[in-house]
Swiss-Prot record:
PROSITE patterns: ENOLASE
Keyword Iron-sulfur on entry: no
Chain's gene name: eno
Protein name listed in UniProt: Enolase
Catalytic activity, as annotated: (2R)-2-phosphoglycerate = phosphoenolpyruvate + H2O
Organismal lineage: Bacteria, Bacillati, Bacillota, Bacilli, Bacillales
Length: 431
């Protein structure tokens, strides 16, 4: 047993230059843990509350001093004296201390920072890497990476409607080789875009952010890059999309407006038709948030039409919330959940969502946020839970590469027992 003797939070910066919360946990044994909380750009309306100060004279209103003070003045006195290995007890105490259904009093960014830092300190105390401490000796599966190599939507200053176009190197024999394949396609894509006279600047998540004629064109240039890198789309490498359709859903009309393509007023059924057409023309294996988060009828139609052959991931739809996920499972909506630790606010609740998904035959994709840091906790979470898939950006920007590098270290440490399932990690669909 090692008792927590101090908890300290400070304001630091994320990859977009916005403030976020860093927390340190100290124990009587000398064990120590530190964690930094990520932040999203396109957020689901049902997510746990990220507490911002709102003082326009400081960081344009995005400061997190109140969240930091909540850790130092309210949460710290509550959990000092806890055994650092009592993760569930500490998380439960913070949830009760907040007392709201969405962590709106103390802030999910305050609570999550403590939750993650406690886990790091506990792992340090028992002398285990974080993934092994959290997952035990069964933690050995490296996740298939979903690499966002073209950024659009709210993640880039361009005219592309869909938020992310991803490559999935499912044909690699190891995680290390999947990273090599992804990097080679990334560099090939840069050359393809350059040769077409297109912008090769990158967006929030490290992917390229060119202006393109359509969402279809984004898929076409990625196919060209895959072939240029010496791989075959639909065999070595598949495609994925995070549509983030809530960002272009018109609440007044109840329709979808693809402004970049000049197509407005699309119904849910027309959006589903569009996805079906794209899936026939391209080797798309995963679609995230294809309809608005509140368009459950649309999601049901999408699942009926594509759910047997395409992974349909609920991000804004489920917001890492077991109540939302349970409703989706009951109604037969989607077949996968995106896991973002700051959508729910504690590690305990995060693990509960992953476990619920697996029991229902849904996949779980551990994910970063667009506002990231050098913190690589989600890499360990992906292995600890044998989630099978991770979405943590492109092959550029240190805030993204930090997670890939941590996974490379973990694979190296696991040695011969490391598992990379590739295409088999998509157990929710038929290929």
């Amino acid at each position: 047993m090692s008792t927590i003797i101090d908890v300290y939070a400070r304001e630091v910066l994320d990859s977009r230059g916005n403030p976020t919360v860093e927390v340190e946990v100290y124990t009587e044994s000398g064990a120590f843990g530190r964690a930094i909380v990520p932040s999203g750009a396109s957020t689901g309306e049902h997510e746990a509350v990220e507490l911002r100060d709102g003082d326009k004279s400081r960081y344009l209103g995005k400061g997190v001093v109140n969240a930091v003070n909540n850790v130092n003045e309210i949460i710290a006195p509550e959990i000092v004296g806890f055994d650092v290995t009592d993760q569930a007890g500490i998380d439960r105490a913070m949830i009760e201390l907040d007392g709201t259904p969405n962590k709106g009093k103390l802030g999910a960014n305050a609570i999550l920072g403590v939750s993650m830092a406690v886990a790091h300190a506990a792992a340090d105390f028992v002398g285990l890497p974080l993934y092994r401490y959290l997952g035990g000796f069964n933690a050995k599966q490296l996740p298939t990476p979903m690499m966002n190599i073209i950024n659009g939507g709210s993640h880039a200053d361009n005219n592309v409607d869909f938020q992310e176009f991803m490559i999935l190197p499912v044909g690699a024999p190891t995680f290390k080789e999947s990273i090599r394949m992804g990097a080679e396609v990334f560099h090939a894509l840069k050359a393809v875009l350059h040769d077409k006279g297109l912008n090769t600047a990158v967006g929030d998540e490290g992917g390229f952010a060119p202006n393109l004629g359509s969402n279809r064109e984004a898929l076409e240039v990625i196919i060209e890059a895959i072939e240029k890198a010496g791989y075959k789309a639909g065999e070595n490498v598949f495609l994925g999309m995070d549509v983030a359709s809530s960002e272009f859903y018109n609440k007044e009309t109840g329709k979808y407006d693809l402004a970049g393509e000049g197509r407005t007023g699309l119904t849910s059924a027309e959006m589903v038709d569009f996805y079906e057409e794209l899936c026939k023309d391209f080797p798309i294996i995963s679609i995230e948030d294809g309809l608005d988060e509140n368009d459950w009828d649309g999601h049901k139609l999408l699942t009926e039409r594509l759910g047997s052959k395409v992974q349909l991931v609920g991000d804004d739809l489920f917001v890492t919330n077991t109540q939302k996920l349970a409703e989706g499972i009951e109604k037969g909506i989607s077949n996968s959940i995106l896991i973002k630790v700051n959508q729910i606010g504690t590690l305990t609740e995060t693990f509960e969502a992953i476990e619920m998904a697996k029991r229902a035959g849904y996949t779980a994709v551990v994910s970063h946020r667009s506002g990231e840091t050098e913190d690589a906790t989600i890499a360990d979470i992906a292995v600890a839970t044998n989630a099978g898939q991770i979405k943590t950006g492109s092959m550029s920007r240190t805030d993204r590469i930090a997670k890939y590098n941590q996974l490379l270290r973990i694979e190296d440490e696991l040695g011969e027992i490391a598992v990379y399932d590739g295409i088999k990690s998509f157990y929710n669909i038929k290929r």
